[in-house]
Curated annotation (Swiss-Prot):
Biased composition (Polar residues): 373-547
S-S bonds: none
Family: Belongs to the SRP1/TIP1 family.
Subcellular localization(s) per the UniProt record: Secreted, Cell wall; Cell membrane
Gene: DAN4
Protein's name according to its UniProt entry: Cell wall protein DAN4
Molecular-function GO term, any one: structural constituent of cell wall
Length: 1161
């Protein structure tokens, strides 16, 4: 989410009142507009510094004013530094980044509208389609001239592609094939949701020629999918007056647009054929047509969680090496251009593009206007239709907050929050004599919006009885967009809405106990000792995805209040960076006397090369092998393996020469090896060692020389070792890179190996990629992670039985020392929409005839979670009374059951300790003085009253997942395409207890059982006869998690009370440092029934997952602690039952693809 907090300082430069009351139309490059745009741009760089860092590395020729870098690292009033930058320079910088449409435009529009500035270019025309069930608010047609500039990054990458002038002509033909496909495919996802198809399909036109950028402007066809009815106004009018049993599930807007937002970067596949062979480009163009719905995310998706998920994208660049052993010299390098699989797997870039736009505007002008003006049913909110300078008109990019407080005898709280550019969340609370909860949640794109009300709705939240007729209402609801968002919905690009209400108008829980045994002994215990919880949460947007910033909770509470911050470290962890480096060989390398083909090994080392041997001299003289290595930025590394029928020779010396290609983003390195014929053969090379200082143009914000404490350096080394003897093949590579910024030091090393014995058909691989991130902020911490991958797979051709085993183990460790603050709430949203495209090459052999099929498998997985919470509260009060010297104990149990439905959200703590669900246990001990008189004798006793309040929430999650798989099979020369829809309904019930961030008082015991049933309909045709099969896929997943709390207690106070000769000792303890150990075992058994020719076969694919975590919480006065956990270590074993030989191991990478692979049978 873009932090626009600096805009507050910019607005002071403009006229304050006059500019807001009257709408002014200014020239596009007015000085105020420049300053506001630059403030948003600088704030966005701070919030996504590594994303800009990566962008600058791929566009080194771009220049930036030195004032930008100075402003990024100057947290004071930096606005005066930016006054000298021209409007054209501002437009070039801001619109040149790929996330301009999705993130910068809404933020700039919001910032400009707050200053009363609305810019428009009236020459363009557009059509608006608004979907809303409550009111039709027409949005004005505004276009921007600089929205299509997002296509410029494609031209820079493609410039490296053509090695000869002839090859550059062939890719242009592929453009014609991509243009029509975009229109046709855009109709396909219309059924699911509009926002997927729209516009900006221009980015997929990768051809190097600049003319291609003009062809896709006919994106008006994408207006049809505006049927997205994102039922934002699904007002689920759950205004159930009584708070009890209002289990109305807010299943609102599960229409979550499967916003195929993956921006599948398939366009980059056209840059892969760096080896001048043109035949490869034609195949890649067909691949890019499959996910034609790719470019949508650049138009609308307010990819809120893209900051955290972008890091994990590099993990999917795992592997492929695809080359056959055909002894060809030139065509060998073309075969492995199928490495586009690694690029298409970058689907997690927009894994959580929670688009809430309900209105899409497609215009005939070069820019697409997207209006997220969303009409709401609240009459208090005036027009949301206001022209904005950017091409995405957001009527109210900042949520319009209207708080109405009605003062009456029965205090009512009515707060209405409307957010347009984000999921509209309307929360209405009415508090009367009996606290009535009326929660109205309206979610548009996905049920990702969260309304969390930390209010004293529980009738014990009042430490002072306010008896005045006028409600004493504390409503923390500030509308400021500063980084210290206190209880305010600050949602422009991230649909995380949090509302906190604190009110002291709640009734006092009064427990009136009358003993009937003796005359007139009345004990009135009024539980008015519980405090008013008034918490102000101050959060600061993270500077980067590594989350080195730390927030503080400032809480004003009574002595008995506990500000329980919740923690999350399981699923959403932005600092968990997993980089996989897998080596996969698709063919066997045998000994021969021919010049071998090249093998491509893809790792995420940031280096892409293709090596091809060019000459080989006979053994009578010194052997000389020369190879040319072409490097680019596609994160791959390629080496050549030389085979020989005679004893292989080691190279004795090598010369390396490197040169840079200034016209593009690649460099060329040439390596020549010399050897004597008496030694065995091997290849050893060291690649790419570079370092830069703070003035290097390759580093983002390198002009920060004005800041003496800032320094930037990059060091990257890569070594590889390949040896082939006459009987075995062994490959190993290592890569180490590190860079230092003003607040971070990151180092990454990747070590991978591959081995295969020619006498065996089994090859093995292993890789390790440890990562270390050290923070240089005021809270010093070091975070390290390591991913170890290993596996065995068969590489023999023409084998009908294949077994593959893959094991992945990831470990994370966080060490935090001397933090200024311990814990702060941070909202996260758990709703996910992802599109995955996997291209699989299957070789089938029958009767000595082998056929290779290229089967694209597209998986669309849309998830929407609805949580129904049932809360049981049991209050047990024990009162001891002693009338007439006889003591009796009376226990008064009070059970309260509350049920509410809410969209799922996770509250994470800064140290990412644990996931939390709203479960709370309180222990309250009061000391009461009771005077009892009987027969003229009075006795005063100190009676301790212990109240135990145990709350346990049962969360029931119902998840509907629809996976549509397209499979192409060829039999007898006839190919047919099957579309297999798989609908998965998962239901889980989880009962958990709370782990508190501060004191970790409780144990956790969680048991989860989920039953997964998928029913697949497959139609198979053979010889003109079609058969429809109903293939049930059942999966049973049982998870058990236990968390033990070994706690050391520290005595705090000992109190002795004596009365009437009887003494009572009361000891109060404080919880010491706790250590949690969590272990879990999950076994998923998937059974697939396949029927063919009247014979049915059942295949079972077990997946075992074991997790173990050790958690040491950070106390409030933290000195040093360590948090370590190891993520899932899983093993997948699949037997194909003699059907096909899957020669790409990444089929088994995920469970869903494993099921798809079985369905291929």
């Amino acid at each position: 989410m873009v932090n626009i907090s600096i805009v507050a300082g910019i607005v002071a430069l403009a006229t304050s009142a006059a500019a807001i009351t009257a709408t002014t139309t200014l020239s596009p490059y007015d000085e105020r507009v420049n300053l506001i745009e630059l403030a948003v741009y600088v704030s966005d760089i701070r919030a996504h510094i590594f994303q800009y860092y990566s962008f600058r590395n791929h566009h080194k020729t771009e220049t930036y004013p030195s004032e930008i870098a100075a402003a990024v690292f100057d947290y004071g009033d930096f606005t005066t530094r930016l006054t000298g930058i021209s409007g054209d320079e501002v437009t070039r910088m801001i619109t040149g980044v790929p996330w301009y449409s999705t993130r910068l435009k809404p933020a700039i529009s919001s910032a400009l509208s707050k200053d009363g500035i609305y810019t428009a270019i009236p020459t363009s025309t557009s059509t608006t389609t608004t979907k809303s069930s409550t009111s039709t608010t027409p949005t004005t047609t505004i276009t921007s001239t600089t929205s299509t500039t997002s296509t410029t990054p494609t031209t820079s990458t493609t410039s490296t592609t053509p090695t000869t002038s002839t090859t550059s002509t062939t890719p242009t033909t592929s453009t014609t094939s991509t243009t029509p496909t975009t229109s046709t495919t855009s109709t396909t996802p219309t059924t699911s949701t509009t926002s997927t198809t729209p516009t900006t399909s221009t980015t997929s036109t990768t051809p190097t020629t600049s003319t291609t950028s003009t062809t896709p402007t006919t994106s008006t066809t994408s207006t049809t999918p505006t049927t997205s009815t994102t039922p934002t106004t699904s007002t689920t009018s759950t205004t159930s007056q009584t708070s009890t049993k209002s289990t109305t599930p807010t299943t609102s807007s599960t229409s979550t647009t499967p916003t195929t937002s993956t921006t599948p970067t398939t366009s980059t596949t056209s840059t892969a054929p760096t080896t001048s062979t043109t035949s490869t480009t034609s195949t890649t163009s067909t691949i890019s047509t499959a996910p034609t719905t790719s470019t949508t995310s650049s138009t609308f998706s307010t990819s809120s969680a893209s900051a955290s998920s972008v890091i994990s994208t590099t993990a999917t660049t795992s592997t492929t090496f695809a080359s056959l052993t055909t002894p060809a010299t030139s065509t060998a390098s073309t075969d492995h251009t199928t490495s586009s699989v690694s690029t298409t797997n970058a689907f997690t870039t927009s894994a959580t593009t929670t688009t809430t736009s309900d209105t899409y505007i497609s215009s005939s002008s070069p820019s697409q206007v997207t209006s997220s003006a969303e009409p709401t049913t609240v009459s208090e909110v005036t027009s949301s239709v206001e022209p904005t300078r950017s091409s995405q008109v957001t009527s109210s990019a900042e949520p319009t907050t209207v708080s109405e407080f009605t003062s009456s005898v029965e205090p009512t709280r009515s707060s209405q929050v409307t957010s347009s550019a984000e999921p509209t969340t309307v929360s209405e609370f009415t508090s009367s004599v009996e606290p009535t909860r009326s929660s109205q949640v309206t979610s548009s794109a996905e049920p990702t919006t969260v309304s969390e009300f930390t209010s004293s709705v529980e009738p014990t939240r009042s430490s002072q009885v306010t008896s005045s007729a006028e409600p004493t209402t504390v409503s923390e609801f500030t509308s400021s967009v500063e980084p210290t968002r206190s209880s305010q919905v600050t949602s422009s690009a991230e649909p995380t809405t949090v509302s906190e209400f604190t009110s002291s108008v709640e009734p006092i829980r009064s427990s009136q106990v009358t003993s009937s045994a003796e005359p007139t002994t009345v004990s009135e215990v009024t539980s008015s000792v519980e405090p008013i919880r008034s918490s102000q949460v101050t959060t600061t947007e993270p500077v980067s995805s590594f989350g080195s910033t730390f927030s503080e909770i400032t809480s004003s509470a009574e002595p008995l209040s506990f500000s329980k911050a919740t923690t999350s470290a399981e699923s959403i962890s932005s600092n968990q960076i997993t980089i996989s480096s897998e080596l996969i060989v698709s063919s066997v390398i045998t000994s021969s006397s021919e010049i071998p083909s090249s093998i491509e090994v893809l790792t995420s080392s940031g280096i892409s090369s293709s090596v091809e041997p060019t000459s080989l001299v006979g053994p009578s003289s010194d052997e000389s092998i020369s190879s040319t290595e072409s490097l680019s930025a596609t994160s791959t590394f390629t080496s050549a393996v030389v085979s020989s029928s005679k004893a292989a020779d080691f190279f004795t010396r090598s010369t390396v020469s490197a040169k840079s290609d200034v016209s593009g983003n690649s460099s060329t390195q040439s390596t020549t090896f010399f050897a004597t014929p008496s030694t065995p053969l091997a290849v050893s090379s060291t690649v790419v060692t570079s370092s830069t200082d703070s003035v290097s143009p390759n580093i983002p914000f390198s002009e920060i020389s004005s800041s003496p404490e800032s320094s930037t350096a990059i060091t990257s080394t890569s070594t590889s070792f390949i040896a082939e003897r006459t009987s075995s093949l062994y490959l190993s590579s290592s890569n180490m890179s590190s860079f230092t910024l003003s607040t971070f030091t990151v180092s990454q090393s990747i070590v991978s190996s591959f081995s295969m014995e020619p006498t065996s058909s089994v090859a093995s691989f292993a890789s390790s990629s440890p990562l270390l991130v050290s923070s240089r902020s005021n809270c010093s911490d070091a975070r390290s992670s390591n991913t170890i991958s290993s596996g065995l797979f068969s590489t023999i051709e023409n084998v009908r039985n294949a077994t593959s085993t893959f094991t992945n183990l990831s470990t994370d460790e966080i060490v935090i020392t001397s933090c200024k603050s311990s814990c702060t709430n941070e909202d996260s949203v758990l709703t996910k929409t992802q599109v995955s495209t996997v291209e699989t090459t299957i070789t089938s052999c029958s009767g000595g005839i082998c056929t290779t099929l290229m089967s694209p498998v597209t998986t669309i997985n849309a998830k929407a979670n609805t949580l129904t919470t049932t809360e049981t509260s049991t209050v047990e009060t024990t009162i001891t009374t002693c009338p007439g010297g006889v003591c009796s104990t009376l226990t008064v149990p009070v059970t309260t059951i509350t049920s509410e439905a809410t969209t799922t959200a996770t509250i994470s703590c800064e140290d990412n300790e644990e996931d939390i669900t709203s479960t709370e246990t309180e222990l309250l001990t009061l000391e009461t003085t009771i005077t009892s008189c009987s027969g003229g004798i009075c006795t005063t006793l100190m009676s301790p009253v212990t109240t135990i309040n145990a709350k346990a929430n049962t969360l029931t999650t119902t998840e509907t997942s629809t996976v549509e798989t397209t499979i192409t099979t060829c039999s007898g020369g006839v190919c047919s395409t099957l579309t297999v829809p798989v609908t998965t309904i998962t239901s889980e019930a989880t009962t958990t207890a709370t782990i508190s961030c501060e004191d970790n008082e409780e144990d956790v015991a969680s048991t989860k059982t989920e039953l997964l049933t998928m029913e697949t309909t497959i139609t198979s045709c053979s010889g003109g006869i079609c058969t429809t099969l109903m293939s049930p896929v059942s999966s049973f997943n049982s998870k058990a998690t236990t968390s033990n709390n070994a706690e050391s207690t520290i005595p705090k106070a000992i109190k002795v009370s004596c009365s009437a000769g009887a003494c009572t000792t009361l000891t109060t303890v404080d919880a010491g440092i706790s250590m949690f150990t969590r272990t879990g075992l999950s076994i998923t058994q998937t059974t697939v029934t396949n029927c063919s020719g009247g014979t049915c076969t059942m295949l079972t694919a077990p997946i075992a997952t074991a997790t173990s975590k050790v958690i040491s919480p950070i106390p409030k006065a933290s000195s040093a602690t360590s948090i370590a956990h190891s993520s899932a270590s899983y093993t997948v074993s699949i037997n194909t039952n003699g059907a096909y030989n899957f020669d790409k191991d990444n089929i088994f990478g995920t469970a869903i693809v494993a099921v798809v692979a079985l369905l291929l049978l």
